[in-house]
Amino acid sequence: MALFGSSAPAAAAPANSAEDVQQTKANLIAQLQQEMAMANAKKLISKVNQNCFENCITAPGSSLSASESTCLSSCMEKYIQFWNAASKAYIARATTQTVAANAMATEL
């Protein structure tokens, strides 16, 4: 009796080559990285909108004053610069930890 009560014999699953497995793994990693980048961009935009609007727009109206526009531009630039610096530091630390972990694994 085959899988799930079928009377037909179960077919053998095709063996995946090491190249297929590596390609699938690389594709999955790339997709996850892209999704994480998109989530981070959405989070950045949300934070910029929330904080800069609260700090720069004192009296919402039909248009922005020159000072509000300048404040928003400055605020957004600061947030983006900070975000980039934090991201670079995080990536550098993660890379260092990955290299150290790989070195320890090869020693064993």
Curated annotation (Swiss-Prot):
Location(s), subcellular: Mitochondrion inner membrane
Keywords: Chaperone, Disulfide bond, Membrane, Metal-binding, Mitochondrion, Mitochondrion inner membrane, Protein transport, Translocation, Transport, Zinc
Pfam families membership: zf-Tim10_DDP
An annotated GO cellular component: mitochondrial intermembrane space protein transporter complex
Disulfide topology: C52-C75, C56-C71
GO molecular function: metal ion binding; protein transporter activity
Lineage: superkingdom: Eukaryota
Bilayer topology annotation: Peripheral membrane protein
Transport keyword on record: yes
Domain-level remarks: The twin CX3C motif contains 4 conserved Cys residues that form 2 disulfide bonds in the mitochondrial intermembrane space. However, during the transit of TIM13 from cytoplasm into mitochondrion, the Cys residues probably coordinate zinc, thereby preventing folding and allowing its transfer across mitochondrial outer membrane.
Protein name: Mitochondrial import inner membrane translocase subunit tim13
Organism: Emericella nidulans (strain FGSC A4 / ATCC 38163 / CBS 112.46 / NRRL 194 / M139)
Gene that specifies this protein: tim13
